[in-house]
Amino acid sequence: MDSSNPYFQQARRTSVVKSLIIITVASWLAVQAGIQLLQVDISQYLALYNYNSEKFRPWQLFTYMFMHDLSGFMHIFFNMLGLWMFGSVLERHWGSKRFLTYYLITGMGAGVISMLAMTWQLNPMFESVQAYLANPGYVQFERFVSDNMPGSYQNDQLNQFLKNWYYNQQNPEYVRESVRAVMEISDMRLNTATVGASGSIFGLLIAFGMLFPNAMIMLLIPPIPMRAKYFVIIFGAIELFSGLRNNIDDNVGHFAHLGGMLVGFILLMIWKRRDNNRSGYQPFEELP
């Protein structure tokens, strides 16, 4: 997106946006340093786990927003870019207090919806686990792995196990090993953590689209201009489609994104109704 757009030229980096960027980047660097220097990964206490996981703690609904993917820079980079581009405009429009309230509520709301969606997505796997425990076997195990284990986790050791079992299907030891593997796969999926400020960023995105629907946004790929309201609709539709696909190889929290948009929309409607009762205040207006 093109920051030379006149709407964004007015978006000075304000205090809350600046502070959030500093805190988020510092948190990401601190986690990296802890792993590299102390062999301690504090993100396992701060990332958001499903409420059915033994690793879940209530404070994670707040702290997960400041954790990001450690395997690369792009996750945190694009989130902070979105925070700066959209957040700066919104903080100027709302003021720091309302902006921070909105950012945190949409982020935590996105976390709640993400956990609920994850439970829905995992239910078929839990049913498959029970079915396998009741009737274990080579064919059933192969199907379970294909349906429930992300491709990135399927390695040579697993393939060798399947190959050996194929030629020794009467050996009960393979059944016992497969049961342990099924439970490990189930635990791995259940204990997958959610990290990132994306829920809040998508909340900012819908707020920008509703407050300034006719603002022109220049996309990077493809490089075409688009009104904010259409940009939000397209992004929301893509996230909904991707989330409903429930692809186990997709490592993106689509329902966290949708959750941020939904909570943001509800909060905007509440504020609009309340603010309409205040004389002279127009919560939905164009930037000058």
Annotate each predicted stretch with a short phrase:
Residues 1-288:
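A detector for small-residue-rich transmembrane helices and their helix-helix packing motifs
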